[in-house]
Amino acid sequence: MPRLDVEKTIEELSLGEKVALTAGIDFWHTASVPRLNIPTLRMSDGPNGVRGTRFFNGVPAACFPCATALGATWDTELLHEIGQLMGEESIAKGSHIILGPTINTQRSPLGGRGFESFAEDGVLSGLLAGYISKGIQEKGVAATLKHFVCNDQEHQRMAVDSIVTQRALREIYLLPFQLAMRICRTACVMTAYNKVNGTHVSQNKEIITDILRKEWGWDGLVMSDWFGTYSTSDAINAGLDLEMPGKTRWRGTALAHAVSSNEVAEFVMDERVRNVLNLVNFVDGLNIPENAPEKALNRPQDQALLRRAAAESVVLMKNEEDILPLKKEKSILVIGPNSKVAAYCGGGSASLDAYYTVNPFEGVSAQSKGEVKFSQGVYSHKDLPLLGPLLKTADGKTGFSFKVYNEHPSESNRELIEQLHLVSSSGFLMDYVNPKIKSLTYYVDMEGLFTPEEDGVYDFGVTVVGTGQLFIDGELVVDNTKNQRQGSAFFGSATVEEKGSKELKAGQTYKVLFQFGTAPTSDLDTRGVVVFGPGGFRFGASRRVGQEELISNAVKLASEAEQVVVFAGLTSEWETEGYDRDHMDLPPGSDEMISRVLDVNPNAVVVIQSGTPVTMPWANKTKALLHAWFGGNECGNGIADVLYGDVNPSGKLPITFPVRLQDNPSYVNFRSERGRVLYGEDVYVGYRYYEKVDLAPLFPFGHGLSYTTFTRSDLTLTTTPEKPQYEESGEPITATVTVTNTGKVAGAEIVQLWVAPPATEVNRPVRELKGFTKVFLQPGEQKKVEIVVEKKLATSWFDEMREKWASEKGEYGVLVTGTGEGVLKSSFKVEKTRYWLGL
């Protein structure tokens, strides 16, 4: 299709066509105007993989490590490669636009989507986001920076007003977007759900137009988050180009009326349309046909990149007495709830059906040359494990039948609309469609056969956005149709899990029937959350086992084992969009299990998987500790590569791990109170706070050990002569450092450059990260590395009185750190105070 002549096309569009172009037509597509050769564009989540157009029963995709995992790599080249693969995955899914990366800021360890953002520091987050976006857009696919801005909690996210000073807004929350834009002018930006200082961002002219467009000179498309548009005229006039998803709530006839009554000027309408048409031209080279089929790639080279990313993200937190790496020839006992669970991604928009997954037990087993034993230790599921994979159909397939009807189960002569075969007993129906379905109200019968392997009492659980009843051999075991209570699943729109139990016999086959009614059949009060169309369902089961029995068995085996590794942590049940965690603790029983295992085997290695910090009351007991995040498809292999030394760990923490939740600077100001949240810590987010008040965290930002040792030496600074005002170059400062691998194995060092300000007009952090680089070295190898920072970015704070950045005169300290304790120091001067605005 030929590129559009944008100005000529705008002249030829009718008002109705212009209005249509400013809103989606469904969950994932924009409007088309065939007579003018304007195609529909497809977009897809998301932050750690390209799901495609279907949450429900979709085409599998590559799942990358979560953003905090990628943040832990501190590797811009790796992020660039990952972006390129994401672009190729997007093309395979027929998608022109990727809804990511996410670059919000982890004010608190509890944020439900904290795992979706790279770091608590704007420089690290912004640079990584810029390089992953660059990789995406080099493939012709549009990247989307989100959520612009201050969408840093899930509690009342659509209604909460984030009250933040202009200084903190600029220095902390807008900074990652600003720095990412300097590397890659992303084609799209997605607004946040929340208000900032009294106005929803999607209709906040100061943020969208004055800062993003005018000050930063960005000219791409601004879209809303899903259902995150709250007005007609205000949003259009503020600069919101595209309301998502369709069908529109705020555009349509209301927008046409606003234009005809001069509430929205026609030239403003044309600006919104111009940005849509420019996006069409941006992705024109993809040549993706409308309604393109979705395909899977899953190539060997992609699997290798995913494995490399998983391994590079692992952070070696402790390694006393060189417990690690483990010996492949020795036997090993694998313990813990995350051992046989592939915690490959968080929940919500980040979730997808991965091509395949490798859990930690599988990763260890594949590499060990000795005997591998397993002990559960504890279970850590928030809801009961999915029952679907344990069911069989009548013809012996794993899974169950999924039969759709318009009529309630009580009605006779129901007409079968569609029958599917599913394996997962968790389904989000927001994008399930069938032309025979008459409305959002319909019913599904799911049937399968369950043959337990052990006698005992089995617990069954049902979570729904809608209504659900679960029957075993015709007996109602779980009824989740009445007196429903709000839970956290499905973006916070679901009920809590309702449970029932039944005693079952090993080897006996039972018929399981789950009857589901869609969201309109529910009486649940869902004010303040988004209910996505027909809703969703989840049913699970587990044999009831006493926790003490499980822990005691693990402890006994650990006391006798040659090598022990404990896998614990969180999963997508605990960290998910739509819900903030209540605390930092591991799931019930995990801490006790780890502590008791360490009591009998102090050399046991502990591996924690989570996207954000957790408490570790046993940390002083352990000699060897890894943090492994949500590692994508290859999480198990990546962890095993590090455990056995095939990969030397090089990850560094992108977020601070406090000793306890109360130590976090946002502790007294997190979650919405009467519709607002006060960002009371101001610019003292993360390490800035801990260093300012001299409070030691459990593990600091930037921490991470290696199996080798490094030295850093010969720091030199090269500065640029000052001019009366800052020019576009920003007056580069080049720091040169010699890095030497003084150990016996190859490894990667991350060199971090910090700037410490002199006394200025305002209180400032003790030091701030301003640059970094990663270098790979063989044993004994030495390399010179350069880190280039701009003086104006390295020295400035935002002056609210002048409404400009202030680079104050004075002597600024330069600190260079990395693995180990050594710090190189130097300094440079700013001779004259200067003020500036811009990107």
UniProtKB/Swiss-Prot annotation:
- Which residue ranges does the record assign to the PA14 domain? 395-555
Q: What is its EC number?
A: 3.2.1.21
Q: Which sites does the entry annotate for glycosylation?
A: N197, N620
- Keywords, ordered alphabetically: Carbohydrate metabolism, Cellulose degradation, Glycoprotein, Glycosidase, Hydrolase, Polysaccharide degradation, Secreted
Catalysed transformations (reactions) = Hydrolysis of terminal, non-reducing beta-D-glucosyl residues with release of beta-D-glucose
Per the Swiss-Prot or TrEMBL record, the active site comprises D225
Q: Does the keyword Secreted apply?
A: yes
Name the predominant localization: secreted
Where it sits in the cell: the answer is: Secreted
Keyword Hydrolase (UniProt) = yes
Task: List the protein's name.
Answer: Probable beta-glucosidase I
Task: Give the organism, scientific name.
Answer: Aspergillus flavus (strain ATCC 200026 / FGSC A1120 / IAM 13836 / NRRL 3357 / JCM 12722 / SRRC 167)
What gene, per UniProt, encodes this protein?
Answer: bglI
